[in-house]
Amino acid sequence: MSYKTEDVMYAEKETSQHGGTKDAPTSQATSRSTAEYRALDAAHHIHPFSDMGSLNRAGSRVIVKAQGVNLWDSEGNKIIDGMAGLWCVNVGYGRQELADAAFRQMRELPYYNTFFKTTHPPVIELSALLAELTPAQFNHFFYCNSGSEGNDTVLRIVHQYWATQRQPARKFVIARKNAYHGSTIAGGTLGGMAYMHEQMPSKVENIVHIDQPYFFGEAASDQTAEEFALARARQLEAKILELGADNVAAFIGEPFQGAGGVIFPADTYWPEIERICRKYDVLLVADEVIGGFGRTGEWFAHQHFGFEPDLITLAKGLTSGYVPMGAVGLHDRVARALIDNGDFNHGLTYSGHPVAAAVALANLKLLRDERIVERVKVDTGPYFQNKLRETFAGHPIVGEISGAGLVASVQLAEEPLGRKRFANGGDVGTMCRDFCFNGNLIMRASGDRMLLSPPLVVSRPEIDEIVSKAEAAIDATARQVGIR
């Protein structure tokens, strides 16, 4: 057997250390040996969110090729990507249409800014298409390079909005514990992750947090999921009253928590959050960086939960990760306030970058024209969710499956029926993640929750493979902790 593209050819070889087949790469793309790549990487590259000493001693796995939902490393091992990179490769790897869009735009207009009375066709066309795809009241978009920058931009927009409303005292932004809104200083402050805050003595002022709606880990034994979600939502009202309603600018939340564990609140949660925001005239911000562009089977995750935000943060699936780009969508009432009130003094060198905009435009057309989002809603999404629930029903260390569409988490637990978590849950999750990695599946750990978010083009047989590999890793974890 061989796997061949115009760039790389792999010839089948002996069994590899990671299982399956080990293929020998024979192309310029992998001209160095794995050992050489690792040595250079250790010598010069600081990785994100990594213990560099430990990583350099072990050596990074060098990824050299991707196609569809699969990756190949420098040793020729084929890996199925259960996380779409970092939640972003919605249309799958290797789409020639996106490469062609980037190439054409680089030849025509590789860069120009949108600062000083100038614009360009790609960003104009992208904005018009986003206005079609987003809910009816979203017709204006500000561009940046990532979700982190998008949430920084949200803060600038929120404060400018209230300045235009002659209510400058509205400075407080309420977020949630164990939320993730990026890793810039502002994004990290908005996020409620203690381990990030510990390394950030310089935090943004006037950001406060309420508890997350994590039923399995934090509900009382006599609470239903609906009662718990309602109680957690009502913490928002209590916090607004504590701060003074005239001092609160906005509430920000991911429709479902992504990096925090793919936590889906009960149906009582978001309607109550929206009711409270409207009652006190607090802007409601939906961080759609992970949930946007089809992940739940709806174009945007807030549509899955049935609420209407005032601002939405977009990234990841906007370009399927092929090039960096983020955006903030503004509800008409917010956009009109900015448009009618002079300068908005915020921007980035690459705001609305023409190549990124061209790739985003081509990517969104694929999602629309190939009906990828609809397929997630009616076919692969339900199949994925059912497959997970059937596979792990009654498993001795699985407490719950949470998710919708093509995003899910598997809660690891010492006593599933009693919702008793492992005392060393983070270690157990890391162990399970490593079993997945060694079994050539990318499955992420968030503490004791194992996360899956494959490309939206994943097929039913590929879902079967992902779930089978996940089951093998979780079985191995159960044996390792002495439960199976």
Which residues are covered by each model-predicted region?
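Conserved N-terminal phosphate-binding loop of PLP-dependent enzymes in the Aspartate aminotransferase
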Residues: 3-14, 20-484
